[in-house]
């Protein structure tokens, strides 16, 4: 998918002379969570939200005593730098000694109206609500929302901030979910879900998006999702975020927040050591762009918690000097990290003027690699590098910081730098290099698809999902949330069973899925995972003739011309029955006078049509691999992996007179100011 260039830049690329231009910025977007405040409050069920004035309002159900005589308390913070605000709690009116401590609690902001929820534990089992119209300064209530039927106890409360409340409550056989809505000055009757009961209840979180509710809830060990359409009060089961086949690992108190287009799901993950011998209890933060596919996330092992943590992005507190920060809130301890701001010199650095040389390498099935040499004369960058294992004092040049590279040429008159972003890379290596004649900084970085080489912590089993769903799922598990899938019919094909194994890399799983129908993928400059189905009808996006510096036209004959694909055997009386599909290259057989057979087995294919489709894709790949070209041309920022090219060499006597339609299989862009190099070397296969 060729990058778009301005008309001026296209004109320069088609010219005979060019003046290279580039831009390189280093940006630290990493959330360096660290202890921020230590109020020391006893751990308990809790929740938090931002009020309209930018203040942070928290609630907790205190613990201790009988269990049905707890308090619901509230806290309002306007200046997060003030420790006293984190330790001050006020009991809400009518909530002293009357709250069920294990019913959990919730708080939400419904268009400026704050509501806090908890279950009455003494004198009734009402779900109570308190209201604040002044950003949490004062509160009224409680009012009864609903009394769960049969005197049931609540096992988790959540609110999406849409004048709503959702909760898990006891029913025969386990727990059910219900909801109520506020309208016209009163709460609606209970709407109970139509799904089967779950074995236990350990928290629920709610979000309202695109006129639908998504609920994430826990039975104590697994994290489930379901949907609710308020238009027809329709419930629907959703995907399982984290499944459990035993009671070894617990997951409780899910909480949701949203910032910068991503949802963050926080839950407490714990192990009592009964089965594994390992004992821990800490928050895990998962992320998602669509509430369907979630990353494995990040653990905060050094932030122990039992009853819940809340992740909040707080860009503008109404008072104090904290600035834009992200927080993970527990009652005993507050963790925080600075949000990225380009105006912060500790997070942003323009290193364009110091680039001595760079090489970027892109190839199929591997993360793109960038190696940069920066001029470090007089130690200009010495103090801007974060030391390895630093616990604070972060600088822009640090491990996992982003290197954003743009390439182009000077255009117009007078000459003006015109560049196009070609990649975003995560810093993996930092080296200071000193010699009598040199002083430079060597940076090596890889694009975000390197996350695909991480290993899965837990096994996940998927049954009856489409290929497109599974590709998006594996990508999200690795932290790749933006994905573009082809619109061909293969993406909608059902994969009967797929297992993401614990200890397996996500790339292994993604490659296995893509191999079903011959798909390829790469990460573009905006960190979008581009998944493509290659076809011989793909257009040529660029033509080369006079610009060619060196070229090699080649071909190889070591390839198959008859492909047989066997899938899952059909169910029937015959034990010898097979599910197969075949593809033939008759022209190649006639050319070489040989049948070269490739036999491929894929049990994920269940029909002869699917087997025939895969056979045709494998045969097409064999035909593409027969073409082996390489070319060196002036650096072209428009080109990406798998783009189609037209190559036409000069006629005799200066050239070979060869021409070809081909596809980029790998590319190496090299810039070296000291040696006057600005070129691109490409390895090509057939289109």
PLM region descriptions:
Residues 1-35, 40-41, 47, 59-60, ...:
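Acidic, small/polar-enriched beta strand-loop surface segments
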Residues 1-35, 41, 339-460, 515-518, ...:
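Assembly/oligomerization scaffold segments
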Residues 32-341:
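Extracellular, repeat-based ectodomains that mediate carbohydrate processing or recognition
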Residues 89, 129, 142, 190-192, ...:
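Well-ordered beta-strand positions in beta-sheet-rich domains
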Residues 106-107, 156, 205-206, 256, ...:
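Short amphipathic beta-strand and strand-loop transition segments with alternating hydrophobic
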Residues 114-115, 164, 213, 263, ...:
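Short beta-strand micro-motifs in enzyme catalytic cores
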Residues 335, 413-419, 431-556:
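Charged- and aromatic-enriched interaction segments used to assemble
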Residues 681-687:
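Glycine- and charge-enriched low-complexity intrinsically disordered segments
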């Amino acid at each position: 998918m060729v990058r778009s260039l301005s008309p001026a830049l296209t004109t320069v690329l088609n010219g005979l002379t060019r003046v290279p231009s580039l831009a390189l910025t280093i940006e630290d977007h990493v959330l360096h969570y660290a202890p921020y405040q230590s109020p020391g409050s006893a751990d308990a069920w809790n929740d938090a939200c931002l009020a309209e004035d930018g203040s942070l309002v928290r609630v907790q159900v205190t613990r201790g005593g009988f269990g049905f005589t707890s308090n619901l308390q509230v806290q309002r913070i306007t200046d997060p730098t003030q420790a006293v605000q984190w330790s001050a709690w006020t009991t809400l009116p009518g909530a002293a000694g009357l709250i069920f401590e294990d019913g959990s609690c919730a708080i939400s902001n419904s268009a400026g109206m704050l509501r806090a929820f908890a279950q009455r534990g003494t004198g009734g089992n009402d779900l109570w609500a308190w209201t604040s119209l002044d950003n949490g300064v004062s509160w009224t209530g409680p009012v009864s929302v609903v009394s769960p039927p049969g005197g049931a106890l609540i096992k988790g409360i959540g609110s999406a901030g849409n004048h709503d409340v959702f909760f898990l409550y006891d029913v025969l056989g386990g727990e059910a979910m219900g909801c109520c809505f506020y309208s016209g000055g009163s709460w609606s009757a209970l709407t109970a879900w139509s799904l089967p009961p779950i074995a236990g209840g350990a928290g629920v979180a709610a979000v309202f998006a695109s006129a639908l509710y998504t609920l994430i809830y826990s039975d104590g060990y697994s994290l489930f999702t379901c949907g609710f359409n308020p238009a027809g009060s329709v419930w629907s089961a959703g995907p399982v975020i984290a499944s459990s086949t035993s009671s070894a690992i617990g997951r409780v108190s899910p909480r949701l927040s949203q910032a910068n287009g991503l949802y963050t799901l926080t839950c407490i993950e714990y192990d009592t050591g009964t089965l594994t011998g390992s004992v821990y209890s800490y928050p895990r933060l998962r992320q998602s762009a669509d509430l369907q596919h979630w990353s494995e996330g990040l653990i905060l092992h050094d932030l122990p918690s039992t009853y819940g943590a809340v992740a909040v992005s707080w860009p503008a507190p109404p008072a104090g000097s904290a600035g834009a920060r992200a927080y993970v809130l527990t009652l005993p301890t507050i963790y925080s990290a600075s949000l990225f701001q380009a105006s912060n010199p500790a997070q942003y650095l323009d290193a364009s003027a110091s680039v001595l040389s760079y090489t970027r390498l892109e190839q199929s099935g591997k993360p793109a690699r960038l190696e940069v040499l920066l001029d470090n004369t007089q130690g200009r960058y010495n103090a801007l590098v974060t030391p390895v294992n630093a616990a604070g004092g972060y600088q822009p040049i640090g491990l996992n910081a982003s290197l954003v590279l743009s390439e182009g040429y000077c255009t117009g008159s007078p000459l003006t730098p015109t560049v196009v972003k070609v990649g975003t890379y995560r810093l993996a290596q930092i080296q200071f290099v000193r010699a009598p004649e040199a002083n430079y900084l060597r940076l090596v970085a890889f694009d975000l698809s390197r996350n695909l080489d991480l290993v899965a912590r837990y096994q996940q089993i998927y049954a009856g999902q489409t290929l497109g769903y599974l590709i998006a799922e594996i990508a999200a598990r690795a932290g790749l949330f933006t994905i573009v899938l082809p619109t061909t019919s293969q993406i909608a094909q059902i994969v009967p069973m797929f297992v993401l194994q614990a200890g397996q890399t996500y790339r292994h799983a993604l490659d296995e899925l893509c191999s079903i129908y011959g798909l390829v993928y790469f990460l573009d400059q905006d960190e979008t995972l581009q998944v493509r189905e290659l076809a011989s009808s793909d257009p040529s996006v660029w033509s080369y003739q006079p610009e060619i510096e060196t070229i090699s036209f080649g071909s190889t004959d070591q390839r198959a011309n008859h492909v047989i694909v066997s899938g899952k055997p059909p169910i029937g009386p015959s034990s010898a029955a097979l599910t197969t599909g075949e593809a033939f290259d008759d022209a190649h057989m006639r050319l070489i006078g040989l049948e070269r057979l490739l036999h491929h087995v894929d049990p994920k294919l269940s029909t002869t049509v699917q087997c025939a489709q895969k056979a045709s894709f494998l045969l097409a790949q064999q035909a593409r691999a027969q073409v082996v070209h390489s070319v060196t041309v002036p650096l072209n920022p428009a080109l990406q992996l798998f783009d189609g090219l037209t190559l036409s060499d000069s006629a005799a006597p200066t050239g070979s007179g060869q021409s070809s339609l081909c596809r980029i299989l790998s590319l190496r862009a090299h810039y070296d100011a000291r040696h006057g190099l600005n070129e691109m070397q490409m390895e090509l296969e057939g289109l």
